[in-house]
């Protein structure tokens, strides 16, 4: 399967419009005003570049802005946010802050999603980014024409289309808006209700119901925790935490049932891989998201953007065929400090602060990275991963572009807090993490109410 990447890469080279690498971009267009887009804008502003953020919704914040609606908004645009009521972050806040704009001392490590959204708005006000953000501007097409990019967008309130020229494009449209629902035998036979976690907004509406939750990623575990005392029956189907019994499994009520993968659905429930049968009223798929870049095509941009991967990207950021286009925020693992580093790298490239290798060298680097992932037993859909060593990735960005080197303690906290999540799902958010040096941190059990230091 990895060989297909090489074939697709060669085909993309045949249609690529060729490399054009300006020393400094006079106009930069950013797609998306979520975490990654805002981080990029701040650095572009630091370097004195002219930029505009095109945001499809009426608000900044991307998935961090809670919206109780599902389906479409007042302009008929899909609700992009996958946020839900009472969400708390699943990584310590020190791993999520923008560089140079840290959270105030004394804040608990696992803040609410609402508090983090307030922090993002405070960041925008502090750096004066709002005047460069164009809301209700849905990007519909991006095309390379000679030495410029033509970016077409629709004003969602008027349905009028406009096209602007850009020297440099940063794609920061996020990866948590297009639900991934796997095909499972018998789905069409099931007569109950189904939904994806993207449309999960609050627990109370499931009170008294019998619910099947599929998936054990961050949203799956959160939904299970929220529903455990609400539903009359809660079935959790997952294959990731096969050894969960060796950890400190939450003290779920008697209505909780853990199951392996669904073998096939029935009219009123499902048969699982252990050949047991359960009935339920609702299925919630917590099965992740697809990439979604409908405004790009290989012919128009030189990039191959599918629902599972975007390629070929040098350093998981730069469009190798057209290096005046970068992507911020589609890499794995999803580590906010990593996104901030990518944003800084993109801004430095747009500002002409460093020069990329030749196309041939970037391609060889990318192919070597793909081979490394293959040897490390990564899946094909993980081709946008930075690899098993996040610290080495930070060092590479620092060495090439002069991006300030992120101390190794951040990666250590990321790994350690993830381990704590598995060991104590019920209480892992009650710990405080405090970074005390470039290599050391402290962890303390400190349950307390939130006092958010930021206003609306």
UniProtKB/Swiss-Prot annotation:
GO terms for molecular function: flavin adenine dinucleotide binding; N,N-dimethylaniline monooxygenase activity; NADP binding; senecionine N-oxygenase activity. Optimum pH is 7.0. Optimum temperature is 40-45 degrees Celsius. Its EC number is 1.14.13.101. Hemolymph. One of its GO terms (biological process) is protein homotetramerization. The keyword Oxidoreductase applies. NADP(+) binds at residues 215-220. Residues 1-22 form the signal peptide. Its cofactor is FAD. Larvae store pyrrolizidine alkaloids from their host plant S.jacobaeae as non-toxic N-oxides. This serves as protection against insectivores; after ingestion of the larvae, the N-oxides are reduced in the gut of the insectivores to form toxic alkaloids. This is Senecionine N-oxygenase. The gene is sno1.
């Amino acid at each position: 399967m990895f060989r297909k990447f090489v074939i697709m890469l060669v085909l993309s080279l045949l249609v690529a419009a060729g490399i054009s690498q300006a020393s400094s971009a006079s106009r930069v267009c950013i797609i998306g005003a979520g975490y990654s887009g805002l981080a990029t804008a701040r650095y572009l502003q630091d370097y004195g570049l002219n930029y505009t953020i095109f945001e499809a919704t009426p608000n900044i914040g991307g998935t961090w802005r809670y919206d109780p609606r599902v389906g479409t908004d007042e302009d008929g645009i899909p609700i992009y946010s996958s946020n839900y009521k009472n969400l708390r972050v699943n990584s310590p806040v020190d791993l999520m802050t923008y560089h140079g704009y840290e959270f105030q001392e004394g804040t608990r490590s696992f803040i609410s999603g609402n508090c983090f959204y307030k922090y993002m708005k405070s960041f925008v006000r502090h750096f004066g980014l709002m005047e460069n953000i164009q809301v209700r501007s849905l990007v519909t097409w991006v095309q390379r024409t000679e030495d410029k990019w033509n970016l077409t967008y629709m004003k969602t309130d008027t349905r009028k289309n406009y096209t602007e020229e850009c020297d440099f494009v940063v794609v920061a449209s996020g990866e948590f808006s297009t639900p991934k629902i796997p095909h499972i035998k018998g789905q069409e036979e099931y007569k109950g209700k189904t939904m994806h976690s993207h449309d999960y907004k609050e627990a109370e509406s499931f009170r008294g119901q019998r619910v099947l939750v599929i998936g054990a990623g961050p949203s799956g575990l959160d939904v299970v925790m929220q529903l455990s005392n609400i539903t009359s029956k809660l079935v959790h189907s997952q294959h990731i935490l096969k050894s969960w019994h060796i950890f400190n499994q939450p003290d779920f009520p008697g209505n909780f049932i853990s199951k392996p993968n669904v073998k096939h659905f029935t009219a009123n429930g499902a048969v699982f891989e252990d050949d047991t049968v359960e009935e339920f009223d609702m299925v919630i798929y917590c099965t992740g998201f697809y990439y979604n870049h409908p405004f790009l095509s290989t012919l128009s941009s030189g990039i191959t953007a599918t629902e599972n991967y975007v390629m070929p990207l040098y350093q998981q950021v730069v469009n190798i065929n057209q290096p005046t286009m970068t992507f911020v925020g589609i890499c794995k693992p999803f580590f906010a400090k990593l996104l901030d580093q990518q944003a800084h790298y993109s801004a430095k490239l747009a500002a002409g602060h460093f020069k990329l290798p030749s196309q041939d060298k970037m391609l060889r680097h990318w192919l070597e990275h793909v081979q490394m992932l293959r040897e490390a037993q990564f899946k094909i859909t993980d081709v946008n991963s930075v690899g098993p060593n996040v610290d080495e990735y930070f060092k590479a960005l620092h060495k090439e572009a002069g991006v300030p080197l992120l101390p190794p303690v951040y990666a250590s906290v990321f790994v350690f807090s993830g381990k704590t999540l598995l060991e104590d799902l019920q209480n892992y958010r009650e710990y405080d993490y405090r970074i005390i040096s470039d290599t050391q941190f402290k962890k303390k059990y400190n349950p307390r109410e939130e006092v958010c230091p930021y206003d609306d």
